Amino acid sequence: MSQLDTEKLGLVFQSRPDILNGIKEAADSPARVDLFNNIAAFVLEQLTADAADQPVSKRRRVDVDQTNGTPNGNAKTEGTSSTDVVAEAAAEELQLEIKDISVSIPQRKKYNLCLTKHFIFARTNADPKPVAGMVWRWEDIEHVFFLPVPEKTQQQFNYVFLPRGTYLPASNNQSTTGAKPQQPSTSAAAEPLLFTIPQAAPKPGSLAGKVAAQAQVAADSYSSLVNWAVPQFLRAAATRLGLSSPVEIVASDPKQFASAVRQSHRPSEKAVHVKAFRGSKDGYLFFLRTGILWGFKKPLVFLPLDRIVSVSYTSVLQRTFNMVVEVDVGDGATEELEFSMLDQEDYGGINQDYVHKYNLQDRSMAEQRKAKRELAENAKKGGAGAAAGEDGENAADDGDTNMGELQKAEMEEEQRLQDEEDEDEEDYDPGSDGDSEGEGTSSEEEDGDGDGGGDDDDDDDDEGEDDL
């Protein structure tokens, strides 16, 4: 009896393991085996032909070279197929396995989450190999977030892992304003990773791998376990790339932003999200110290602060308003994203506590944010080149120069702020001393009341911060 061509079938249906399993179960006769093999060969041939016919600027790598993101310093971007990455990940020694984790993206299903030296991947209890399309290199992870799941009676948390090139609006397609697609990374997965954990501790027998014993000590809760394990692999990846600052797990913080809308299911807890639609899809906006994230439906969108050109508002009604964010998507092109139906109660918090805090409403500040980002990226590239042994001395010199430029930009910004303060002092009227002092006292008392009133609500959040 002939056998299924599992390699071709895996390439064609890498994002649909349910279909692949169904084919394996249905292949109970030579005729069906041949039929499935012929279908896989035909589809793969068509996909490859379609990719070859497309212009280079619009070509999307399919199956045999399914990649995503922007390459980091010394990552290889060519000649690495998805099957090669899966095989490479499967061959590495398993450091830690966390069983029965609820994954939502790329696929909604329970998987075992596996951590090795170079990879994080998902697999099932029935198959020791990684699931095709669910393998990520640590070096390709650019952002990690730890966020509460909105509107749940029982507290749950989402972890979001964003590889390079998977979170900007023009990541996978040609931008309508002329931006080029971002360069591919070396991960087999073309999507972010999103999984959900409960507030409870892992059940006995949920951990396996080389460091399972050490991990058990940190497993007071799922969040404390993940926050103990993941940063170690991110730091190691940063070291391999020659970067001084590893990727951090960024958590939501009610002191950074808290919604004014009261949560009916957990009234004593401040909400750190705002309901918002993107097109016809409903979701939630999180205003974080590194940028604005919209989730948790595909496609996830993250807008880093240093890529935001401006923020404006439209359709301001009695109960709702829309927020428009203009984003730098590369090569001098920008794209506008509109988030609609935000609650009017949150306008003040968004506009004053976040947008004005980071000067996101001021287009003139966007160039400075962009310059700082590019200087920092160039410095990182210099460090990565030195780590790879390629033009090490030149890369180090470039890194020093770029860091000098970055410090210069920061000093110029500090001088600008100082000049504004000096202008305020020149406009100061000595005759209003009494009133000013009185107003200052009142303001301080109000600030004190605000801090005190927030302590009770921050207790729950502090527990989450301890986990970090």
Curated annotation (Swiss-Prot):
Location of region: Disordered: 55-82, 365-468
Organism, as annotated: Pyricularia oryzae (strain 70-15 / ATCC MYA-4617 / FGSC 8958) (Rice blast fungus)
Bias type Basic and acidic residues, positions: 365-380, 407-418
Principal cellular location given in the protein's record: nucleus
GO molecular function, one term: histone binding
Subunit structure: Interacts with histones H3 and H4.
Gene: RTT106
Name of the protein this chain belongs to: Histone chaperone RTT106
Compositional bias segments (type: Acidic residues): 390-400, 419-468
Domain of life: Eukaryota
One GO term describing the cellular component: chromosome
Role of this protein: Histones H3 and H4 chaperone involved in the nucleosome formation and heterochromatin silencing. Required for the deposition of H3K56ac-carrying H3-H4 complex onto newly-replicated DNA. Plays a role in the transcriptional regulation of the cell-cycle dependent histone genes by creating a repressive structure at the core histone gene promoter.
Subcellular location: Nucleus; Chromosome
Alphabetical list of Pfam families matching this protein: Rttp106-like_middle (PF08512)
Polar residues: compositionally biased ranges: 65-82
Entry keywords, A to Z: Chaperone, Chromosome, DNA-binding, Nucleus, Transcription, Transcription regulation
Family recorded in the similarity comment: Belongs to the RTT106 family.
Gene3D superfamilies per record: Pleckstrin-homology domain (PH domain)/Phosphotyrosine-binding domain (PTB) (2.30.29.30)
Presence of keyword Transferase: no
